[in-house]
């Protein structure tokens, strides 16, 4: 693939976004409406997407992930906003794919950005790999938003706050990625899967090996799968 196209299993038009962007828009709207982080409002908006197609590019919910759906069902039944499962089998990429509004909104307060990156995952994806992937990716985004260059934020020594990852260590699987695993691999070792560790690695591999958005996006897309 060398340009944006339509089609696929959902027969979308070129430029129509899918589930992860819908959820990112829900999260962004919640931050705006609540003037900050409110987990319950986020979950209510995610449910509205599921039930009514809120923030969908087609007007209907489609391609909802199993882990997300189970968390929304639990929230509907209990009212508990932190309904994400902790099992390793639930370590999908749903929470990191919608993450961007958190570091953007809290870009002037890195401590809050990292705290809420973790909490934003726990609403639907509470496995430690999902939570730590969100913390790590939020740190990278914070660095870029503050003007740091790619080499700096992808260094294994980089931290958005002095000693943050020393005082708040990442789990082993995410720490390996942060230490640069993506710099020494190529497909098929790099996979566009729905597993959060492989998704994080694939995103960083695409970023590391390209110099502009178009090239990076195409590199990720051409991995295939999720």
Where are these regions (language model features)?
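Structured, active/binding-site neighborhoods that engage oxygen-rich ligands
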Residues: 1-226
